[in-house]
From Swiss-Prot:
InterPro entries: ACP, ACP-like_sf, PKS_PP-bd, PP-bd_ACP, Ppantetheine_attach_site
Record family assignment: Belongs to the acyl carrier protein (ACP) family.
Location (main, coarse): cytoplasm
Keyword set includes Lyase: no
Species assigned in the record: Rhizobium leguminosarum
UniProt-recorded name of the protein: Acyl carrier protein AcpP
Function (record text): Carrier of the growing fatty acid chain in fatty acid biosynthesis.
Gene Ontology MF annotations: acyl binding; acyl carrier activity; phosphopantetheine binding
Swiss-Prot/TrEMBL GO biological process terms: lipid A biosynthetic process
Keyword list, A-Z: Cytoplasm, Fatty acid biosynthesis, Fatty acid metabolism, Lipid biosynthesis, Lipid metabolism, Phosphopantetheine, Phosphoprotein
Domain of life according to the entry: Bacteria
Length: 78
């Protein structure tokens, strides 16, 4: 797992209080990890702060899984 993926995973665990083994690339924030719309907004803000990237609203709406977040951040930092 990449450094970005590890950091995303830690943020998700800290914000949602879920078990580490549930935070896999294919895990949906809402369907698999129990996040609500406020949680997803807070996650996006935490990703922006941690990685120093801006995630526009339209992009945030397409970040539905842990893997989506990792891919967006990797692309934004490239």
């Amino acid at each position: 797992m990449s450094d970005i993926a590890e950091r995303v995973k830690k943020i998700v665990i800290d914000h949602l209080g879920v078990d580490a083994d549930k935070v896999v690339e294919s895990a949906s924030f809402i369907d698999d990890l129990g996040a609500d719309s406020l949680d997803t907004v807070e996650l996006v803000m935490a990703f922006e702060e941690e990685f120093g990237v801006e995630i526009p609203d339209d992009a945030a709406d397409s970040i539905l899984t842990v893997g989506d977040a990792v891919k967006f951040i990797e692309k934004a930092q490239a």
